[in-house]
Amino acid sequence: MNVPLRLNLLLILFSLSFSAYTIYDGSKLIPISYAPNEDYDATEIVSTSAISQEMLSYYSWFASYGYCEDVDIPLFCCKDFINFFTEKWTIIIESSTTEFFDFNFVLWRSDEYKKYIFAFPGTRHDIIELLNEAVNIKLVNYNDEDNGIKVVNYFYKVTKEIRDLLFTSEVLKDFDEHPGYQFVFTGHSLGASVAADILYDAINRNIISPSEHNPALITFGMPRTGNEEWVVDFNTKVKNVLRVVRDGDIVASLPYSLINNPYTHLGGLILVNKELTSMYYCPKDIGEDYPDKVCVRTKSLDIKYHSYYFNPDTKFSSRCY
């Protein structure tokens, strides 16, 4: 077995033995009611001051929409998705392939809700291909600048491929014609990291001007995406980060932070319990080294904890419900 891969697997097993789930006094309990998320009032500004299960469930639909383009998924699995989106949202741009990766993305606009939503699904590769890619993961300089800001090469490679496909002159013109709209970026798994990278890149290229409530990032099962310097700089530009993780989701613990590759998580953790009955907002700006009585996630090799969020509303693995 490849040595880096063996080390990664040993680290997974080690963490499974020593992890525990507790909550700390600063966390905020958010009950899960399973109210139909199509009834959610999407005019609400996405922010960390107004977190609800209905809001997160609503945006999880967008994060999983891209899976509908998988040729192996029967059409009926996506019928409700399609009906849900076309009634309220206009597709501005949609892409299903890149040179490097079998990856798609969608940009919507709603004039009723005054929002743009950028959505990125996870990988459609099988687990063996993912493990092969994981062996070669490392941190690289963002934008080839030697300023200490580093991002994971695997996610950044996808980002660089799709950013010019996404931010076309027609799309930028559409932005200019709809001032004051909130930009919401969302994604699941790999797509969560790409959503963060694309958002960060758009700000640095002056495509989006950050403000108190704009833009916002909502992710589901997001892996670690950059180093601490990247996270700190990200936080100065994006004030509303909602990083949703289901307890037991092993992907949210990857890549493992090693001495020569100090991967760091964004803050804004919203920890959903394994039973999908409640969740806690853990207000911290960076990483997962909480003080006493911390929000600590358990880890499991059961992929369902990564594939299923807000069941029955969204099933990222089967995409049917």
Feature map (PLM): residue ranges:
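Classical eukaryotic N-terminal signal peptides for Sec-dependent ER targeting/secretion
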Residues: 1-11
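Catalytic-loop region of hydrolases
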Residues: 60, 64-94
